[in-house]
């Protein structure tokens, strides 16, 4: 059970497989942080495709899958939306997600995904 001072983020990964090898890795399996702390969720990917899309989703305890962002491989701009920010680094094949000033409402399973 979560208390008001504890946020738990469970990390999972999704890999959309095509005829070319693709892989998404989220090494962190579970993260616990104190409320109001910042937390960064790491996502590293591998693909041979030159054009691809990266996604972040979250699934809160209520069960619905919530779309957060889609990033095109040709658009390496970072993005900030409220307390959420995404850092896309094509050179290191990473697409990390940061929650600033975490809140109990942020408790969820977070998914990073890759698609052609």
From Swiss-Prot:
GO MF, one example: peptide antigen binding
Ig-like domain location: 22-116
| Residues bearing glycans | 96
Q: Where in the cell is it found?
A: Cell membrane
Q: Return any one Pfam family short name.
A: V-set
- The UniProt gene name for this protein comes to TRAV19
Q: List the disulfide bonds.
A: 43-112
Q: Report keywords, A-Z.
A: Adaptive immunity, Cell membrane, Disulfide bond, Glycoprotein, Immunity, Immunoglobulin domain, Membrane, Receptor, Signal, T cell receptor
In terms of Gene3D superfamilies, this protein maps to:
Immunoglobulins
Q: Name one GO biological process term.
A: adaptive immune response
* Chain's role: V region of the variable domain of T cell receptor (TR) alpha chain that participates in the antigen recognition. Alpha-beta T cell receptors are antigen specific receptors which are essential to the immune response and are present on the cell surface of T lymphocytes. Recognize peptide-major histocompatibility (MH) (pMH) complexes that are displayed by antigen presenting cells (APC), a prerequisite for efficient T cell adaptive immunity against pathogens.
Its Gene Ontology cellular component terms are: immunoglobulin complex; plasma membrane; T cell receptor complex
What is the protein name given in its UniProt record? T cell receptor alpha variable 19
Its quaternary structure? Answer: Alpha-beta TR is a heterodimer composed of an alpha and beta chain; disulfide-linked. The alpha-beta TR is associated with the transmembrane signaling CD3 coreceptor proteins to form the TR-CD3 (TcR or TCR). The assembly of alpha-beta TR heterodimers with CD3 occurs in the endoplasmic reticulum where a single alpha-beta TR heterodimer associates with one CD3D-CD3E heterodimer, one CD3G-CD3E heterodimer and one CD247 homodimer forming a stable octameric structure. CD3D-CD3E and CD3G-CD3E heterodimers preferentially associate with TR alpha and TR beta chains, respectively.
Report the leader peptide range.
Answer: 1-21
Q: Which InterPro entries match?
A: Ig-like_dom (IPR007110), Ig-like_dom_sf (IPR036179), Ig-like_fold (IPR013783), Ig_V-set (IPR013106), TCR_variable_region (IPR051287)
């Amino acid at each position: 059970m979560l208390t008001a001072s504890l946020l738990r983020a469970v990390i999972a990964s999704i890999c959309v497989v095509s005829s070319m090898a693709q892989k998404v890795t989220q090494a962190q399996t579970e993260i616990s942080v104190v409320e109001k702390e910042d937390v960064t969720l790491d996502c590293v990917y591998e693909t041979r495709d030159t054009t691809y899309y990266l996604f972040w989703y979250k699934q809160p305890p209520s069960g619905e899958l919530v779309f957060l962002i889609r990033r095109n491989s040709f658009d390496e701009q970072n993005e900030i939306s409220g307390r959420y920010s995404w850092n896309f680094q094509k050179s290191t094949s990473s697409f990390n997600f940061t929650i600033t000033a975490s809140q109990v409402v942020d408790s969820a399973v977070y998914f990073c995904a890759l698609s052609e």
